[in-house]
Regions:
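Generic "edge-of-domain/loop-turn" microfeature
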Residues: 36-38, 49-51, 84
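Short edge beta-strands and adjacent turn/loop segments
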Residues: 22-41
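Extended interaction regions within the primary functional domain
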Residues: 9, 13, 22-27, 69-70, ...
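Polar/charged, Gly/Pro-rich intrinsically disordered segments
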Residues: 75-105
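Beta-strand secondary-structure signal
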Residues: 41-43, 76
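Short, non-transmembrane amphipathic alpha-helical segments
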Residues: 15-18, 50-74
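N-terminal presequence-like segments and adjacent domain-start helices
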Residues: 1-11
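Short beta-strand-to-loop capping motifs
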Residues: 44-48
Length: 105
């Protein structure tokens, strides 16, 4: 297992976790790693309040991402409502962003 968690590694971990777990209300999913604190952060931003099913699925995603790290790491997963067209914040590495009318222009 690697000791360096760079952009490609983090994005591949997040994207693998997102396979078949993306819900229509998910606007963006992002990830970053704090190597000093040994914490991987995963942020899910939804169009309005996420359904219980979306929360459960995305918690599974965060767990799968954490599974790619050594046992002494923790995950900080956040689920926030950011109704369209409000601006998304995101963490360092954006792994998923929903296509929205502003993006399609």
């Amino acid at each position: 297992m690697t000791d360096t968690y760079d952009r490609p590694w983090l994005l591949l971990s997040l994207l693998r976790g997102l396979l078949s777990e993306v819900h229509p209300s998910l606007r963006q999913a992002s990830v970053e790693a704090d190597q000093e604190a040994k914490i991987v952060r995963v942020l899910f931003e939804y169009d309005g309040s996420p359904s219980p099913m979306a929360l459960e699925s995305d918690s599974c995603v965060a767990g799968q991402v954490l599974g790619d790290f050594p046992a002494d790491w923790d995950v900080d997963e956040r689920h926030v409502a950011v109704a369209y067209p409000n601006e998304l914040s995101g963490l360092t590495h954006i792994g998923y962003r929903r296509l929205e009318p502003v993006d399609a222009a």
